[in-house]
């Protein structure tokens, strides 16, 4: 493009019936076998990478950065419908709960309401 932004043609918000369909989910995790921050990150990294690759969602470690056995990760999802967002949230939660090196202590979900 003339203004130097290569993605200007594709830029935009996914909308259906005037609404943006998006949600965020956070996971409070316990890493019982961790004895160092390095060990904790080694246990969390496959979860974060797996979520990105399998579900194509945005994910980050968001809390407990300095604690050896605690972690919080958050996932953000934008999709074409609330149903699709819910399906992805369900899959993401199952994926995290099945991770062998962690215990899932709790989850919290927030939906974006926008028109």
Model-derived segments and spans:
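N-terminal amphipathic/hydrophobic targeting modules at extreme N-termini
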Residues: 2-5, 10-15
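N-terminal first-folded block
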Residues: 14-58, 95, 99
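A generic structural signal for well-ordered coil/turn residues at beta-strand boundaries
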Residues: 21-23, 71, 103
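A general secondary-structure boundary signal
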Residues: 28, 62-64, 91
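A structural signal for short, well-ordered beta-strand segments
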Residues: 25-29, 73-75, 107-109
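Short, charge-patterned binding micro-sites
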Residues: 59-81
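Short beta-strand elements
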Residues: 6, 55-62, 103-110
């Amino acid at each position: 493009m003339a203004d130097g932004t290569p993605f200007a043609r594709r830029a935009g918000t996914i909308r259906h019936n005037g609404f943006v369909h998006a949600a965020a989910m956070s996971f409070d995790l316990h890493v019982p076998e961790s004895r160092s921050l390095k060990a904790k990150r080694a246990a969390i990294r496959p979860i974060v990478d797996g979520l990105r690759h399998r579900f194509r969602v945005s994910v980050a470690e968001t809390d407990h950065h300095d604690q050896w056995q605690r972690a919080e990760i958050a996932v953000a999802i934008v999709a074409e419908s609330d149903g699709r967002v819910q399906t992805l949230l369900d899959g993401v939660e199952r994926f995290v709960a099945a991770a062998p090196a962690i215990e899932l202590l709790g989850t919290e979900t927030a939906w974006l309401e926008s028109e």
